[in-house]
């Protein structure tokens, strides 16, 4: 198998690349070579916006793309040689916040007031792809987590736990979050390529949401600590002191579960995330959440 992964240096694309290296596949990563490359991959050093004939000679069985925009997709499709399958990792940000929940794959797509341009760019990427290749697969995950996550989400809670800090909770911590482990994302890609379902667009994620309070408790437990909470009921922008917007949403993932009926438990997934984090703290994009708490909320 020859897999091409666009990017391959950060979180999702890096994890996917290493997952297929572990399976013994030929994995080609397409990036500008500004970061350390994973072991076992073959680098195609290029800017995806200026590919020329770089890719023409290759024949890939599958292209896995984390494109952000329609332009990204258009330029890659123009530059590719022969390939069989194309999988785009899109996002739940394509659904407007006012759509009926849980969001179904056929729901109307539009700007989401929390995600803004990120979401509309992903809509463009999907639109361009399906116009050019109606047989491509599109995956719409919720919050992805696990090893290599460079976004300051679970890592923030781990930091609080490691420092024996009280956790500053938005209100009572009842808001639900929906997650999907990056390893389950890879497993589902395998299922798609094996089963080749006629459905082309899939929401992916854990069926069960988790309250913020419970999620924080799990993160602390993984570190070997017990969480104690300070509830924040003031009208403060939640992202100043917490990792997520004050926006609860849920994807309908029943189509995914028909094809792949099991997912990693949050406990196990967070254990894996923590095991990676303690050796890779420098790879996470920290935000000054703890500083804000200490300066403003304490």
Model-identified regions with their sequence ranges:
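N-terminal Rossmann NAD(P)H-binding glycine-rich loop of SDR-like oxidoreductase domains
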Residues: 2-23
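Conserved beta-loop-beta element that borders a ligand/cofactor-binding pocket
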Residues: 126-148
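Amphipathic terminal alpha-helices
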Residues: 266-298
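Active-site "gating" loop of Rossmann-like NAD(P)-dependent oxidoreductase/epimerase domains
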Residues: 91-117, 131
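Glycine-rich Rossmann NAD(P)(H)-binding loop
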Residues: 6, 146, 170-175, 202-210, ...
